[in-house]
Amino acid sequence: MNRLCLVFLLSCALVGCASTSPPVVLSPYPALHDELFTSYEAFPVETEEEVFYLSPEAKAFVDRATIISGGSAHHKSVKKLVSAIFDHSEMGLLYRNNANSTADTTFNNRAANCLSLSIMTYAMAQHAGFEAKFYEVDIPEYWTRREGFSFLNGHINLRVGISKDPTVMNIGPSFADVDFDPQMLRNHFPRINVTKKRILAMFYNNKGADALISNSYTRAYSYFRAAAVLAPELEQSWVNLGVLYRMVGEFDYAQQSYDYALNLNENNLTAWENLAILHRHKGEMDRADEIKVMVDFRRKSNPFYHFILGEQALEEGRYEEALTFYQRALRLDNTRHEVVFGMSKVYYALGDISSAERFLKRAVLLAPNEQD
């Protein structure tokens, strides 16, 4: 089983902005191995300016949205900007877990995940003269499946507030919390303020994952490397580098990368799980089993752990096992549309159409938006 650990929130064609590529940085980190991917510089990553760039059309949208009718350019509304962004998003937005895009591409394509939507909103708020802060939400481990891989999902939202510029007068509330997954806001998960640099590293990490599952290993290394150099405290980058090293047969380097992630956070269960997978590839079954028992024990109360096991069993045609896993997940949390939809899928596979339809209707009612 392959599992990638990343803050996966989504790949569209990127806008080519007038900007030079960021300089290649010589890294002191021993878990980076440029010698394995000698042509990685042929795959330059987007600069910060490119990721947060807004076209004149997008800036005009912000200007129209924020200025109060009948007021001057100095009278602006946080609430109007946030409302306009959601209105724009609702006109055909596709929420996709694989749509990792720059701010301007998100605006034009209206297909993105919450990281890309948050990047776009941040750029728009800054153009309007507002202050914006990113927050990383501490959600339970939550996976999705894509092309045979399991992806650990993180979640980002932000707060848009009035500027400290005394020449700009805000009309209405002084700030707004912006979250493109309404369930996250309702559940009031704790969150911490994170830097723009960390957000950019998350973006690179997601792009690296896109490249990895497309078997573009050198491109993947370029993105993971950029993320690791920019924000070495981001555990996911080191875990993903470990997956990449394992996939190209460099087991010692994979071990080194997982160890680096665990030195940052010894409770990173995805790093431990990938380490178990590595031991299994090396024929060290006892150590692999020992780690797996520990990981399973610590995850058993997480509905998404059972959910992803159900997804994997369903993919492999083990329908009765899948049903058991989905039922366990449902007992732990019966409000998640993903779990309820899983029940619908497995009942359909088992030929129980009546139950499949019943759970499908429940899933539709629980889904926060039409795309889900």
Model-derived features with residue positions:
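Short coil turns that delineate tetratricopeptide repeat
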Residues: 232, 266, 300-301, 334, ...
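Secondary-structure boundary elements
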Residues: 43-105
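Canonical tetratricopeptide repeat
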Residues: 206, 240, 274, 307-308, ...
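Long, contiguous interaction/recruitment modules in multidomain scaffold/adaptor proteins
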Residues: 97-238, 247, 252-272
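Register position in tetratricopeptide repeats
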Residues: 213, 247-248, 277, 281-282, ...
